[in-house]
C-alpha cells in the first residue's frame, strides 16, 4: 500500500460507467470519481495500488492519473446503484481525478476508437483513446503489412488509427493520421500531434512494451510468464486522456492495472494464433504504416 487509506467522503454517488473489472461512480458534490472493484478474479484494489506505485508511476511519473485509496464504510457498497455488479467483499476503492471533458466541451467527434469533446471555436478539447500496441508483435510474420493493432481491427472490422502513425516521432505523420480521420482539423490538432510525437510518455510506453521479447506464444512452455511481459500487456491496454487548451497540452494515463495472467493467458495466446493463422498480418485493407 502506497499510504494508509483515507475515509471516503460521505457523498451521494451515481453510476458513471461499468467495465469488466471495475465500476466508476460520480457525484454532484465533487469533481472526483470513485472506482470500485467488480470482478473478484481481478487484482484487489490494494494490489492495484501496489502495482501502480511500484511499477507504473516510477516509469511514467506525472503522466499517471492522480488517485487516493479510500476505506469503504460498512454497508456502503450495498447501498450503491448497480450494487449487484460489485465485489461486496472489497474494503477499498480509488478516489480519482476526473479526466473527462470540461463543462464547455459540449461538441463531440467520434471515429476510429477516438473520442474528442471540444468547445465552440475549439478553444479547448479533450481526447480519449487507447494507444494500444506502439511496437509490432514479437511473433508477427516477417512479411507483415499490418501492425498488431491494425491486424486485429481488420479481423474485427472495427477501424482504428494505426498507432505506428499516430504516435510517430515525425509530427507530420501523426498530424496526417488525425487529418485522415477528422478532415479539416489540422490547425486544431497541431499541438496534439506535437505531444504524440515528442512526449517522453510514449517513448516510455514503447520501452515498457519492449519488455515482451518473445510474445505470448513464445512463453508457451513457461510455467509463469515474466513480470516484464505482464507490464507490456498492461501498457498495450491503457487509456489516454489528453486535454488541449491553446498550446497547452496535458496527458494522463488510466487503466494501467496489473493484468490477471491466469484469466488472460489462454485468451491472449488464442487471439495471437488466430491473427497469424488467419493471415491478418498480411491482408490488405488497412491504412497501416507498415504498408508504406
Swiss-Prot record:
| Catalyzed chemical reaction(s) | 1D-myo-inositol 1,3,4,5,6-pentakisphosphate + ATP = 1D-myo-inositol hexakisphosphate + ADP + H(+)
Which keywords does the record carry?
Answer: ATP-binding, Kinase, Nucleotide-binding, Nucleus, Transferase
Keyword Nucleotide-binding appears in the UniProt entry: yes
Q: Does the keyword Acyltransferase apply?
A: no
- What EC identifiers does the entry list? 2.7.1.158
A molecular function GO annotation: inositol-1,3,4,5,6-pentakisphosphate 2-kinase activity
What Pfam families does the entry give? Ins_P5_2-kin
Q: Which GO terms describe its biological process?
A: inositol phosphate biosynthetic process
Report the principal subcellular site. nucleus
Q: Where is this motif: EXKPK motif?
A: 128-132
The subcellular location is: Nucleus
Q: Which InterPro entries match?
A: Ins_P5_2-kin
- CC per GO annotation: nucleus
Q: Which family does it belong to?
A: Belongs to the IPK1 type 1 family.
Known function: Has kinase activity and phosphorylates inositol-1,3,4,5,6-pentakisphosphate (Ins(1,3,4,5,6)P5) to produce 1,2,3,4,5,6-hexakisphosphate (InsP6), also known as phytate.
Q: Report the domain remarks.
A: The EXKPK motif is conserved in inositol-pentakisphosphate 2-kinases of both family 1 and 2.
Annotated protein name in UniProt? Inositol-pentakisphosphate 2-kinase
Task: Give the originating organism.
Answer: Yarrowia lipolytica (strain CLIB 122 / E 150)
Gene (name only) = IPK1
Amino acid at each position: 500500500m502506497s499510504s494508509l487509506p483515507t475515509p471516503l467522503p460521505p457523498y451521494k454517488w451515481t453510476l458513471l460507467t461499468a467495465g469488466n473489472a471495475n465500476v466508476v461512480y460520480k457525484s454532484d458534490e465533487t469533481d472526483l470519481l470513485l472506482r470500485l472493484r467488480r470482478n473478484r478474479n481481478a487484482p484487489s484494489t490494494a494490489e492495484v495500488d501496489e502495482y501502480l506505485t511500484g511499477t507504473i508511476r516510477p516509469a511514467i511519473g506525472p503522466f499517471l492519473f492522480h488517485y487516493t485509496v479510500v476505506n469503504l464504510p460498512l454497508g456502503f457498497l450495498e447501498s450503491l446503484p448497480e450494487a449487484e455488479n460489485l465485489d461486496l467483499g472489497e474494503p477499498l476503492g480509488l478516489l480519482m481525478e476526473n479526466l473527462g471533458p470540461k463543462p464547455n466541451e459540449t461538441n463531440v467527434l467520434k471515429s476510429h476508437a477516438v473520442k474528442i469533446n471540444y468547445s465552440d471555436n475549439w478553444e479547448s478539447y479533450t481526447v480519449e483513446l487507447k494507444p494500444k500496441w506502439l511496437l509490432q508483435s514479437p511473433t508477427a510474420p516477417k512479411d507483415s503489412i499490418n501492425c498488431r493493432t491494425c491486424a486485429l481491427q481488420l479481423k474485427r472490422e472495427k477501424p482504428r488509427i494505426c498507432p505506428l502513425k499516430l504516435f510517430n516521432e515525425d509530427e507530420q505523420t501523426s498530424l496526417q493520421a488525425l487529418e485522415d480521420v477528422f478532415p479539416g482539423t489540422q490547425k486544431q490538432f497541431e499541438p496534439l500531434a506535437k505531444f504524440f510525437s515528442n512526449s517522453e510518455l510514449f517513448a516510455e510506453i514503447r520501452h515498457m512494451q519492449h519488455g515482451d521479447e518473445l510474445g505470448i506464444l513464445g512463453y508457451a512452455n513457461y510455467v509463469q510468464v515474466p513480470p516484464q511481459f505482464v507490464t507490456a500487456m498492461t501498457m498495450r491496454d491503457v487509456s489516454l486522456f489528453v486535454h488541449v487548451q491553446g498550446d497547452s497540452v496535458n496527458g494522463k494515463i488510466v487503466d494501467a492495472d496489473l493484468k490477471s495472467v491466469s484469466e488472460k493467458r489462454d485468451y491472449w495466446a488464442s487471439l495471437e494464433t488466430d491473427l497469424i493463422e488467419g493471415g491478418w498480418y498480411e491482408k490488405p485493407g488497412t491504412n497501416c504504416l507498415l504498408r508504406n
